Amino acid sequence: MKLIVGLGNPGEKYAKTKHNVGYWVLDLLAEKLALSFDQKTENGIYVKQPDFILAKPTTFMNKSGDFVEELIKFYKINTQDLMIIYDDMNFEVGQAAIKTTGSAGGQRGMAHIIEKCKTKEIKRLKIGISRGKNAKEYVLSPFLPKDNAKIKLVIEEAANILIFYLSNSFITTIEKFNANKNKV
């Protein structure tokens, strides 16, 4: 069973911030699949299908690993079937990257997931948000109007890639993503 987790911070205060692009991708993915996040735990919300789970932690970003660990243990999911979607300041707005391993790159939600899963071998779809002067203030602010079209396009493409991934292998998904990379 595949587990796809979109990272973000809970609450209306953070809903439109750069740090919540993982939530945005999951929301669009669920909408495209006509699904709703109808299951809830203390640490998050999710929707379970026979072959996959879409999940959003409702803890703050730096505690995202608690919910991921909870779902992995309860549903006996192998970390090889886990994919995390999150914001990355190392990529420009409008860029995205799929990785199979690596450090958290300063992203605290991903760092907590790596800590809880005890491995860096976690698939991830990183959504570029560019870099600001003060990282904390920057990620907790909305995109500039000039970036709205780019971020909307990359969120759409990310959701489409995940739809493809749900019924294909990760390798096939990477090949398709890389073939279309210049379009994102």
Swiss-Prot record:
Gene it is expressed from: pth
Keyword Transport: no
PROSITE patterns documented for this protein: PEPT_TRNA_HYDROL_1
Residues with site note (Stabilizes the basic form of H active site to accept a proton): 87
Family assignment from sequence similarity: Belongs to the PTH family.
Subunit composition and interactions: Monomer.
Active site: 19 (proton acceptor)
Binding positions (tRNA): 14, 60, 62
Name by which UniProt lists this protein: Peptidyl-tRNA hydrolase
Catalytic reaction equation(s): an N-acyl-L-alpha-aminoacyl-tRNA + H2O = an N-acyl-L-amino acid + a tRNA + H(+)
EC number: 3.1.1.29
Subcellular location, record wording: Cytoplasm
Organism, as annotated: Mesomycoplasma hyopneumoniae (strain 7448)
